[in-house]
Amino acid sequence: MTDASSLPLYPHRHLLGISDLSPADIELLLDRADRAVAISRQSEKKTSTLRGRTQINLFYEASTRTQSSFELAGKRLGADVMNMSVASSSVKKGETLIDTAMTLNAMRPDILIIRHQSAGAAALLAQKVGCSVVNAGDGAHEHPTQALLDALTIRRAKGPLSKLIVAICGDILHSRVARSNIMLLNALGAQVRVVAPSTLLPSGIEKMGVIVTRSMAEGLKDADVVMMLRLQRERMEGAFVPSVREYFRYFGLDAEKLKAAKGDALVMHPGPMNRGVEIASEIADGPQSVIQEQVEMGVAVRMAVMEALLDPRRNQEGRKQEGRGA
């Protein structure tokens, strides 16, 4: 990526969670992503930054945005990209994650992107392979690149995140996006509010440094950013809400509820959206929505992450240390 060598060396080998990052790490990735946005907006979008490098996308859960975003990011950086279809792989025959990891490791990839239904899967994979690992979502635990792309979207529209009021509304309980965003926003000095019915709030959520409310009017009051989350019914067992209609009435974002936020508040959604459940179409498609911008920033952030993890200066530093130890 153009002039990336002028930026500090990213200090981590993997991206497993926002919890592993310092504010400086986050800002460094966002700065790199800003450069990637410029590349993505050129007529010639492909660079040779990762030419000769191999990227494997290993998705155990269905994904449209994240998988295609990682694939496009890798190709724009010049990497050789392989998408592994779990549905037609040995996983369906009973192969464990560790066995799959060892098989892929023998192919000598440079970076593995994994999405898995179990929390901690990416961290386990990182212990078993010799390449960099990026967590593309592990159960309800973390989704670090989503939080980074959300932060980039906000920063480009609002400037520094410090002191901004961000309301995260919806299914907090099952959301890895909420967890990663809360950690990132707190790290950069934003005030975070979470808005949800009691049944969709994790116990002890207050310990994450957020303001908790069960009222949209209260949660959205003077907010700079309103981030809506979908009901993750595929992760629910039992009745968490009385009905979709009842949920939208109290917690769905419509024009009337949005009036409580600042007039220039950003409306965000990680996708996929359930229109008429957590957000009205008039808001999703309205002038305050930056949902499509989030998709664009997703490619840029994933380009930045992979470039940072595979920075050739890391190998140079390793060789220097080996030389000193000899």
Swiss-Prot record:
Carbamoyl phosphate binds at residues 65-66, 115, 143, 146, 271-272. Signal peptide: none annotated. It catalyses: carbamoyl phosphate + L-aspartate = N-carbamoyl-L-aspartate + phosphate + H(+). InterPro entries: Asp/Orn_carbamoyltranf_P-bd, Asp/Orn_carbamoylTrfase, Asp/Orn_carbamoylTrfase_sf, Asp_carbamoyltransf, Asp_carbamoyltransf_Asp/Orn-bd. One of its GO terms (molecular function) is amino acid binding. Pathway: Pyrimidine metabolism; UMP biosynthesis via de novo pathway; (S)-dihydroorotate from bicarbonate: step 2/3. One of its GO terms (cellular component) is cytosol. It holds the Pfam family OTCace_N. The keyword Transferase applies. L-aspartate binds at residues 93, 176, 230. The keyword Transferase applies. Its EC number is 2.1.3.2. Heterododecamer (2C3:3R2) of six catalytic PyrB chains organized as two trimers (C3), and six regulatory PyrI chains organized as three dimers (R2). This is Aspartate carbamoyltransferase catalytic subunit. The gene is pyrB.
